[in-house]
């Protein structure tokens, strides 16, 4: 009986779709066939969404359906999808920043109804009605971004609170409780941006390199690049966590910075999969004290449970570059300097292959002052790890690389200049 039902569904999809793909680019046809088979008994609803979508919305609807997680293919109604698309396209017609977007950005970072694993609430219409009034007189995208971000907590009446019932709460769930963690707050902020045609996505890390837990925030696409912003905003690309993000380890997925993609990529968004894969294999009792504390903090405060269908992009290097740029722009105190570090495995320091990517910890007597990661053999030869230190001071530098079984210490002394380079040879 099951086999017969599957064959009937397959036949239904095949015959129905032949006349329904007329306004959809050929590149989606095979993907749509596959999606409708996965939808099983919900295939008529999914097909109705595609069929009833206005001609100018067909490709966007095809994009959503083609890359839709199975959990949504089997449950979402045509009315849910049609309303979501209608309001997304309404913003594209209304706002200059949305009208100017390439399809690839509009489809992937404005049109989607979801971010990670939150409940699929129909938030789009409600949020458009809530937030469109804030951008009515805006013609500049940055002004529009902050016209949403500045009043958002007062509009939705949601504050950060770890007592929330869920980590990845939907806007409706967070607003019912008046609380959310950073994941829930970021979902609200990203959905608010999308509701007025501003491309936005979630970003975050499974675990900071200082092992103090994880974090999630939002990104917006402005001036043809992605910039980060928080629910409690300071400015674009400015927040308390930049120093932590800038010290991410580009060689360890546990410490990468990830951004969410609706369209499948070649890797998953962190959403706990990196945490589970790289940490949960360990016995918690065997973890170093700092890692164990960070792991427990991560479980308490943010998500380590989202599903395997959430895709991501590795944006680690962009955050490292942003942090290094911020250091250059900082005014140094009279007794401070910027120290640049690079680690070599041999004395041939002119060769790119001699460089080693290592963790570099700086100590003054027994107190750890700072840390970071030195450039690898494939990085630009002008790239250094930059740290702010005191002038005319003695330090101990601990260099480690577990993959290559390296652990070495150096004694260094800073001088009286504003900058100083340290090329350390193992």
Locate the predicted segments by residue.
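Structured interaction patches on ligand/partner-binding surfaces of diverse proteins
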Residues: 402-426
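Secondary-structure boundary elements
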Residues: 45-48, 53-178, 265-266, 271-272, ...
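Sec-dependent signal peptide recognition
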Residues: 2-7
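Bacterial signal peptide processing site
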Residues: 18-20
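Cysteine-centered nucleophilic/redox motifs
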Residues: 148, 178-203, 218
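A short, solvent-exposed beta-strand micro-motif common in secreted/extracellular proteins
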Residues: 391-403
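His-Asp-centered catalytic microenvironments across diverse enzyme cores
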Residues: 161-162, 195, 203-216, 220-381, ...
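C-terminal motif of bacterial Sec signal peptides marking the signal peptidase cleavage site
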Residues: 13-16
């Amino acid at each position: 009986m099951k086999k017969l039902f599957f064959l009937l569904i397959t036949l239904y999809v095949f015959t129905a779709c032949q006349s329904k793909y007329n306004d959809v680019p050929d590149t989606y046809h095979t993907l749509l066939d596959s999606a409708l088979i996965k939808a099983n008994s919900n295939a008529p609803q999914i097909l109705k969404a595609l069929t009833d979508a206005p001609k100018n919305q067909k490709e966007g609807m095809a994009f959503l359906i083609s890359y839709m997680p199975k959990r949504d293919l089997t449950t979402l109604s045509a009315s849910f999808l049609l309303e979501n698309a209608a309001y997304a396209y309404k913003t594209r017609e209304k706002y200059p920043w949305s009208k100017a977007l390439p399809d690839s950005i509009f489809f992937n970072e404005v049109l989607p109804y979801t971010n990670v694993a939150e409940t699929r609430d129909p938030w789009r219409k409600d949020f458009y009605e809530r937030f469109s009034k804030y951008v009515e007189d805006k013609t500049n995208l940055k002004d529009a971004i902050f016209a949403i971000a500045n009043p958002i907590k007062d509009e939705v009446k949601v504050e950060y609170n770890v007592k929330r019932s869920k980590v990845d709460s939907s806007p409706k769930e967070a607003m019912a409780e008046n609380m959310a963690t950073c994941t829930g707050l970021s979902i609200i902020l990203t959905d608010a941006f999308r509701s007025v045609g501003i491309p936005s996505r979630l970003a975050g890390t499974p675990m900071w390199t200082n092992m103090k837990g994880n974090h999630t925030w939002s990104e917006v696409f402005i001036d043809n690049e992605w910039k980060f912003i928080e629910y409690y905003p300071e400015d674009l690309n400015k927040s308390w966590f930049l120093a932590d993000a800038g010290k991410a380890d580009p060689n360890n997925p546990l410490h990468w910075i990830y951004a969410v993609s609706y369209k499948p990529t070649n890797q998953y968004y962190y959403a706990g999969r990196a945490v589970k894969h790289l940490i949960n294999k360990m016995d918690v009792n065997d973890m170093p004290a700092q890692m164990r504390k960070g792991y427990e903090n991560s479980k308490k405060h943010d998500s380590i449970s989202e599903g395997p269908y959430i895709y991501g992009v590795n944006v680690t290097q962009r955050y490292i570059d942003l942090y290094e740029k911020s250091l250059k722009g900082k005014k140094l105190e009279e007794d401070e300097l910027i120290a640049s570090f690079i680690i070599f495995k041999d004395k041939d320091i002119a060769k790119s292959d001699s460089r080693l990517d290592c963790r570099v910890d700086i100590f003054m007597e027994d107190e750890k002052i700072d840390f970071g990661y030195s450039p690898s053999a494939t990085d630009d030869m002008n790239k250094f790890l930059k740290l702010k230190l005191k002038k005319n001071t003695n330090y101990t530098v601990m260099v480690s690389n577990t993959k290559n079984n390296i652990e070495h210490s150096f004694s260094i002394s800073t001088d009286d200049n504003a900058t100083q380079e340290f090329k350390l040879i193992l």
